[in-house]
From Swiss-Prot:
Residues 76-143, 150-231 form the RRM domain. The modification Phosphothreonine is found at T430, T442, T452. One of its GO terms (cellular component) is chromosome. This is Non-POU domain-containing octamer-binding protein. Expressed in liver and suprachiasmatic nuclei, hippocampus and neocortex (at protein level). Expression is strongest in neurons in CA1 and CA3 pyramidal regions and granule cells of the dentate gyrus. Detected in testis and kidney. There is a cross-link at K5, K62, K98, K101, K128, K192, K200, K245, K251, K373, K469 (Glycyl lysine isopeptide (Lys-Gly) (interchain with G-Cter in SUMO2)). Residues 270-374 form a coiled coil. The keyword Lyase does not apply. Monomer and component of the SFPQ-NONO complex, which is probably a heterotetramer of two 52 kDa (NONO) and two 100 kDa (SFPQ) subunits. NONO is a component of spliceosome and U5.4/6 snRNP complexes. Interacts with CPNE4 (via VWFA domain). Forms heterodimers with PSPC1; this involves formation of a coiled coil domain by helices from both proteins. Part of complex consisting of SFPQ, NONO and MATR3. Part of a complex consisting of SFPQ, NONO and NR5A1. Part of a complex consisting of SFPQ, NONO and TOP1. Interacts with SPI1 and SPIB. Interacts with RNF43. Interacts with PER1 and PER2. The gene is Nono. Residues 14-27 have a biased composition (Basic residues). It is found in: Nucleus; Nucleus, Nucleolus; Nucleus speckle; Chromosome. The modification Omega-N-methylarginine is found at R458. It comes from Mus musculus.
Amino acid sequence: MQSNKAFNLEKQNHTPRKHHQHHHQQHHQQQQQQQQQQPPPPIPANGQQASSQNEGLTIDLKNFRKPGEKTFTQRSRLFVGNLPPDITEEEMRKLFEKYGKAGEVFIHKDKGFGFIRLETRTLAEIAKVELDNMPLRGKQLRVRFACHSASLTVRNLPQYVSNELLEEAFSVFGQVERAVVIVDDRGRPSGKGIVEFSGKPAARKALDRCSEGSFLLTTFPRPVTVEPMDQLDDEEGLPEKLVIKNQQFHKEREQPPRFAQPGSFEYEYAMRWKALIEMEKQQQDQVDRNIKEAREKLEMEMEAARHEHQVMLMRQDLMRRQEELRRMEELHNQEVQKRKQLELRQEEERRRREEEMRRQQEEMMRRQQEGFKGTFPDAREQEIRMGQMAMGGAMGINNRGAMPPAPVPPGTPAPPGPATMMPDGTLGLTPPTTERFGQAATMEGIGAIGGTPPAFNRPAPGAEFAPNKRRRY
């Protein structure tokens, strides 16, 4: 655990020491001596600082993490130079454990430098301020932010591209750690942006793909241009102690900063340099104006071409819909024709079945009529048969009348015949009763047409009726 007093002292001295680092070497050395006299004891890796017995303030290093900030990124990676040749990775971690858990530690012992990655950018800034120029085994440590080798500069960004959209667009190439759209002091987009990947392969892939193709971020058809980001140090700059003190250095430093006197040698060439710089500025402005006019002209042509393209697309869509409508109409007509043909076939089949049924009914009726005629002869045929039977019966009676009657034993009933049916022995037209018809049916020769019927026998003597009784017909 660390004393909170020493930590707050270093935070208070952060800005003044950084301000006087380039201009007041003596004040910087005094602060360095204070650091040596009061070295900050390390704190555990859990990220908390417990106060001493006199002070009850506790600082949680997790509070230095911004909302939504990613941890252990390239932005929190520090370069540590002037390391002792015998330093170990464990000593390196122990040196930075005050600022939280370290994610990556690399040491190049032969060249005396290394890299370490902390959790957040804020913790890395605090570690850089406190450990820079700190003596370690006779050497002063040099702590800087490591160059982000996987960062790209994106130009020609459309107006309505935000940080989130830029990150989403470039995340197709790999994991993006940070994406920022650069704006001016009023918050207006400048058309430039920065994209930082977690590794070099993703940055190389994005650079190659965007160089070969046209990567569009919005509906505005202007592709973005991608190039490696220039690694510039705009925080520390070039301190006096890092300037190489060679012969040219001493020659340049012979005179202090001043204004050139008119009419002097240096004034004449200073004015010529100034004219050259002005001409460069004018030409650059002219180039910028030409580029601006060309961009405006291209945008106008693009709008006209876009309108024409939209009209063409609408025409194509209309033609496609008309073709689709015509095809649907043809399909509908074909379906109607098929339905009509099916109905005609069904109607023809129904008529054929009805005709077949009608023919079958007529055939059945004809057969029934023929069968009726064969079983029951008509009235004319029946009348002719009856006439023939009557004529045959009369002829038989006349023939048998000349012959003597056969003797009949007493008590024998008279045989059925016309004598028992009619009193005069003639055949009447009235049909006989069932009993007598049955008796007549037993006679021989009645059933054959044109055959000779048997003769009627004379009645027996006992069959005579009384004088007062009439014979029953």
